[in-house]
Amino acid sequence: MSAEEEVNSEILQQALDQTMEKYPLFQAVLRKGLFWFYLERRDIHAIVKKEKRPPCSSLYIPDQKTLLFQVSYYKNRINFEVYHALTDGTGAMNFLSELVQNYLILAHPAADLPWVEQIEETTPGAQEEDSFSQYYSSDIPKNKEKKPAAVKLKGEKLLHADMQITEVIIPVKETLTKARSYGVSITVFLTAMLLCSIHEEIPKNRQKRPIALMIPVNLRNYFPSQSMGNFFGWIEVGYTFADETVFQDVLESVKNQFKDKLDKEKVAMDMNGYVRLEKNPLVRAVPLEIKKYFMMAGANLGSRSVTAVYSNIGILKFPEEYKAYIDRFGIFASTNSLQLCSCSYGDQMVLGFTSKIPDDSIQKNFMRMLREEEIPYKEEKNDFPGCGEQNKKEEIKILQTFTFLCLAVAVICGMINYLMLETLNWFWFAAAGCACAWLVVNVAYFKRRNILKNLTWQLLIITILCVLWDHFTGWKGCCLLYT
């Protein structure tokens, strides 16, 4: 959320403390069970921090018991980042709206800002209920629709949380007027524009496959629920382009697909499909450490039918008195390819593009189409302190220097060993030590995981290899267990 004034961190902390009292679900960490991941309530105080990291940086680090969200601030901006295992877009926006409301009431007591309930009063149990299981029925038939493989975006991807971020602001009224002139909703209109923008970047020899977008669906619109946990599904909307295809053709197809796939019976079939696998007794009996690899393989297989993602969170509403203090709301999502997220407040709709591929051609195509449709827009300049190119270059330079030092130490040890003893026996130990140090640092940098755990596993593996070396060579000089 971008405010009309600089953020006061102390007041923001007070607002966060108030908000946490109403949303106990967020007072949880993600734990590994024997068969599934699960959320565990922890008495950890959520602390407001100044923004330093890139947007959508990793919040969940295995083996570290930390909350699955972070509230930060930078200049006039309040950020709320959340891990998707905790809640979905609707839950996140409800939390942020409550946080912003609490902050503005505390920051401007003389303004007498009205209090509005963002969600109905609920019990902690209702907030944490599993709505998927509540509405699951084994009597609902399977959706047997076969999904064709879609076009995939290609290109070298950025490392870690780094993403190409583009923020575009468009007027709601003019966009709605244009969409209605075509007889469609804003979501259908923007979906068709994104499909066309992607199509322009696909080579001719790859245009036989459809371009498909995953569109998240808020299941609370179909099945009443007070849950603040994940309760969303998705539909896949695509189009196979031909040489004679025009924008109106894509619009008409997308409109019909939305109408067909958002039918309540089909939504229920899809929702049941998400839960059916989890309810399978064979799947439930497989240990998590084995199951997670099949889950990753299944996710990769499922993504074959998707080119990109478009998520429209919808409208954020506040009383008229708040307009003097709120500029706009925006949303970004982490992605392995390309994702567009949108939300609106007042007459401003913010389009947040995130891309793992450092090429903004699709975003430029989209903005060109906005001009062609006579929709004014403003591209916001990125102002994220953790996204500076200088920071990335310094990290890479440090890593390259460390790699050179490891090689240099290994070579020097080899030279000394040969000059003094005319053998290389001890050189291999020095080289192995340098290789271990290099591996620990690189795994820590590229995987961003628990360094101590990586070191422990590495030590265990090396010890086993040493024992095997001694056993099969008969040298009995490598492993200390034999001395």
Question: Where are each of the predicted segments found?
Answer:
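Histidine-centered acyl-transfer/condensation active-site motif
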Residues: 2, 62-105, 118-122, 128, ...
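Short, Lys/Arg-rich, polar N-terminal cytosolic tail immediately upstream
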Residues: 382-394
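Hydrophobic transmembrane alpha-helices and their membrane-interface boundaries in multi-pass
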Residues: 402-475
